[in-house]
UniProtKB/Swiss-Prot annotation:
It comes from Stenotrophomonas maltophilia (strain R551-3). The keyword DNA-binding does not apply. Transmembrane segments: none annotated. Residues 8-176 form the Era-type G domain. It is found in: Cytoplasm; Cell inner membrane. GO terms for biological process: ribosomal small subunit assembly. This is GTPase Era. Gene3D superfamilies: 3.30.300.20, P-loop containing nucleotide triphosphate hydrolases.
Length: 298
């Protein structure tokens, strides 16, 4: 009788500077959208778990806000605290960087993981965007020189290239243990939380360069009526002028934000969604620790 293959399970922090593809990687490993994605830095503001279950084991991925040096505003400080706090009790860390680029914030992220005393896997994302493929090996040699990594994985999270080997090596670092979550569970966050994040994703995608950072979303109502979810979302901004921009001429932009958010919710929740959205002003909320706490920032 052959021995049963050991089952490995543990928590893995996904750490890196802003906009390296941490959330895209988390979603790719989970196989579902649990973390919102945009091409803007600092899209992720909250710590959340993505649960990736395989026959050989289970990865409990701790997706975090991007670590950054500048901490002038309360929002930045809260996000850095969330990222650092995610390392408590984890079994391993994924340092996600962008192929061809290493800067001070990458060094900061590496140092945070190193100081946590856990095995660190280097994940070099966006290799599909490298114009000079021959530059990858010298870049890897430069980054790994003098730094201790358990393994190094060049990948494309968006195209799902290189993930199989990554999963295999990360599972090998985790303790032999039964799964922490059921096979059908993909995140520890509620549908209510995810609904707010999906609205915020559309704000990040549809608004100008700076305005998304002055917005947050609060779900005021979330009720189930058979196969229908009734959701009321408040978009908070910091100034009246910003409110007008979010609403758009004749309410067109707000309608577009609502329509695309609703479609994403229906896809994720597998139910019909009736979504209402409003825009309200709370001056200076992103630099106000009390306001951030009221909006659910850790």
């Amino acid at each position: 009788m052959s021995e049963q293959t050991p089952h490995h399970c543990g928590s893995v922090a996904v750490i890196g500077r802003p906009n390296v593809g941490k959330s895209t990687l988390t979603n790719a490993l989970v196989g579902a959208k649990v973390s919102i994605v945009s091409n803007r830095p600092q899209t992720t503001r909250h710590r959340l778990l993505g649960i990736a279950t395989y026959p050989e084991g289970q990865l409990v991925l701790v997706d975090t806000p991007g670590l950054h040096k500048v901490q002038k505003r309360a929002m930045n400080r809260v996000m850095n605290r969330a990222a650092r706090g995610s390392l408590e009790g984890v079994d391993a860390g994924l340092l996600v960087i962008e192929a061809g680029r290493w800067d001070e914030e990458d060094s900061l992220a590496f140092n945070v993981l190193r100081d946590a005393g856990i095995p660190v896997v280097l994940v070099v994302n966006k290799i599909d965007r490298l114009k000079d493929k021959g530059a990858l090996l010298p870049f890897l040699q430069e980054v790994t020189a003098g730094r201790d990594f358990s393994s190094v994985h060049p990948i494309s999270a968006q195209k799902r290239n290189g993930l199989e080997a990554l999963v295999r090596d990360v599972l090998a670092l985790l303790p032999e243990a039964p799964p922490m979550f059921g096979e059908d569970e993909i995140t520890d966050r509620s549908q209510r939380f995810l609904a707010g994040e999906l609205v915020r994703e559309q704000l990040m995608r549809q608004l100008g360069e700076e305005l998304p950072y002055a917005t947050t979303v609060e779900i005021e109502r979330f009720t189930e009526d058979g196969n229908l979810l009734r959701i009321g979302a408040v978009i908070w901004v910091e100034r009246e002028g910003q409110k007008a921009i979010v609403i758009g001429k004749g309410g067109t932009r707000l309608k577009e934000i609502g329509a695309k958010s609703r479609l994403q919710m229906e896809r994720l929740f597998g139910a019909k969604v009736f979504l209402e959205t409003w825009v309200r002003v709370r001056e200076g909320w992103s630099d106000d620790e009390a306001a951030l706490k009221a909006f659910g920032y850790e």
